[in-house]
């Protein structure tokens, strides 16, 4: 039996590289990988020619233009245009070249700013989005709807998963535009090295957030991709939509900061600056559907933070930022 030829779009990113690591351990797939220089995903002709020549069986669509609040506010046109082009080019070229299985990786920012907690898949398009990343979120919603529409019109098997906040190896540790976990890991690391008496964390520490290690995300992605078609249909009708991926467990930012301090070995005080904004009080995905499909996360937050910090220590000379 010939191996399945699997294209991972975005194989150098945090999620794509985690999917690659797990698939490389298997003997039943042949990975097809292209760097940005080798294949410009914004070029529809280049993407079509790639699919026409490579005989791809499955696609993991993990490529995206990503960034923090400042980047989203400064370059909204780039975020909506580039993400919609990447998705449109890959999904359409996959269809034109008879690739029947594809998994699109979205983001929990697709849900309304004031969505009911925990956020079920049915909350999609039920309210106004968070303004700071609306263009990016709309592009991700378009990706879900592209998959859904090619399924409905052409009978394709294009699936979507929506991850919660991710962290792990190959994250962005830039001091000013990274997400909360890499930002705090770096800050506590530097405070420890400098023997700083305290570390100030923005906000009251009371907001609750959910975090998933990227290796768990990769495992969930492969699990969902490999579900029997009938099982997928049963769990995503009537619109063949998407599946949330998370832990179903959240923690306060205070608990997160204290756990990071423990992992890093920081002995000073953790101070919360309540004059700084907190953001949404709670953001948690409803993962009932994922659990019904037989997948549960395996990496605890503390264990995941410890392994991520170890990766940070080993890659300080080359990490992003």
Swiss-Prot record:
The residues the record assigns to binding substrate are 187, 202, 209, 278
Predominant place of localization: cytoplasm
Marked site: Important for catalytic activity: 107, 109
Q: Where in the cell is it found?
A: Cytoplasm
Quote the subunit structure annotation.
Answer: Homodimer.
Family to which this protein belongs: Belongs to the NAD(P)-dependent epimerase/dehydratase family. Fucose synthase subfamily.
Question: What protein is this chain from?
Answer: GDP-L-fucose synthase
Q: Give the source species.
A: Escherichia coli (strain K12)
């Amino acid at each position: 039996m010939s191996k399945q030829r699997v294209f991972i779009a975005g194989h150098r990113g945090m999620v794509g590289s985690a999917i690659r690591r797990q698939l490389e351990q298997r003997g039943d797939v042949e990975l097809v990988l292209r760097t940005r220089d080798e294949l410009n995903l914004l070029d529809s002709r280049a993407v079509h020619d790639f699919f026409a020549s490579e005989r791809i069986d499955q696609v993991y669509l993990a490529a995206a233009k990503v960034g923090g609040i400042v980047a989203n506010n400064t370059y909204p046109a780039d975020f909506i245009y580039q993400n919609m082009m990447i998705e449109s080019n890959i999904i359409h070229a996959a269809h034109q070249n008879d690739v029947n299985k594809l998994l699109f990786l979205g983001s929990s920012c697709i849900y309304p700013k004031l969505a009911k907690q925990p956020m079920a898949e049915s909350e999609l398009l039920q309210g106004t989005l968070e303004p700071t990343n609306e263009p990016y979120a709309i592009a991700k919603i378009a990706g879900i709807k592209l998959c859904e529409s090619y399924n409905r019109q052409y009978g394709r098997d294009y699936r979507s998963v929506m991850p919660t906040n991710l962290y792990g190896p190959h994250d962005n540790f830039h001091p000013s535009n990274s997400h909360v976990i890499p930002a705090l890991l770096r800050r506590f690391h530097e405070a420890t090295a400098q023997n700083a008496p305290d570390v100030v964390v923005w906000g009251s520490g009371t907001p609750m957030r959910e975090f998933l290690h990227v290796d768990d995300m990769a495992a969930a992605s492969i699990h969902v991709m490999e579900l029997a078609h009938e099982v997928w249909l049963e769990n995503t009708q009537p619109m063949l939509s998407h599946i949330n991926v998370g832990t179903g467990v959240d923690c306060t930012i205070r608990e997160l900061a204290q756990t990071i301090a423990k992992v890093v070995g920081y002995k000073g005080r953790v101070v919360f600056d309540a004059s700084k904004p907190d953001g949404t009080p709670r953001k948690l995905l409803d993962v009932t559907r994922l659990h019904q499909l037989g997948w549960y996360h395996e990496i605890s937050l503390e264990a995941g933070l410890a392994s991520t910090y170890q990766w940070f220590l080993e890659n300080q000379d080359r990490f992003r930022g």
